[in-house]
Regions:
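Charge/polar-rich, low-complexity and marginally structured segments
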Residues: 98-185
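Compact, well-ordered interaction domains used in eukaryotic information-processing assemblies
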Residues: 7-98
Length: 185
């Protein structure tokens, strides 16, 4: 029973369908989505492009939000934080990992985050220790870490040999030798 008092259960808030959320393309290229009923269409041409989506439509994008291909970058309401939206969509584990591991926030601080700056992920990739970087290469948002690392390498910003070796290790064995040459083009 003492354990229950130590761990405070996070309550999933009821989010109104009309709450507007800003999502950003977190892929190295174009992101397009059209719902099966053709009610929701998103077209973002490059990394960082943003679109407004109401919470009701956001449910259709759940898998993209979970793997961080799309990121909730702003909640246009003072009543709900990014983690509130993520919890309601049941993609909170990825967002909790981002807030705790990438930004180093506590549970309480995470509750107060109303926006996400995509550049913070790039800063983490460039400034983290090798150990921190390797942990994220195996975490919930590894696809995004790998994709952003490749983009930063192409742009000449990521040149840490140890991180590049860790990045290569994520590839199948037969691709590792030529991976960085292939990425550089």
């Amino acid at each position: 029973m003492a354990r229950n008092h130590e761990r405070k259960k996070r309550v999933r808030k009821q989010i109104p369908a009309d709450v507007e959320v800003t999502v950003a393309n977190n892929t190295d290229g174009m992101f397009e989505y059209q719902s099966p009923n053709k009610v929701l269409t998103l077209s973002m041409e490059k990394y960082g492009d943003e679109e407004f989506v109401n919470f009701e439509d956001l449910r259709q994008l759940k898998r993209y939000l979970e793997d961080f291909s799309l990121v909730i970058v702003d909640v246009n309401s003072d009543e709900y934080s990014v983690i509130d939206i993520a919890r309601s969509l049941r993609v909170n584990r990825s967002y909790e990992e981002y807030f705790k591991s990438i930004l180093g926030l506590s549970d309480e601080e995470m509750e107060e985050e109303y926006d996400i700056d995509l550049e913070e992920l790039d800063d983490f990739i460039l400034d983290s220790t090798l150990g921190e970087y390797k942990v994220q290469l195996e975490g919930r948002i590894k696809k995004t870490i790998i994709e952003r690392s490749v983009a930063l390498y192409r742009e000449g910003e990521l040149n840490d040999y140890s991180k590049l070796q860790a990045l290569k290790a994520t590839r199948p064995v037969d691709e590792r030798e030529t991976f960085l040459d292939y990425v550089k083009g």
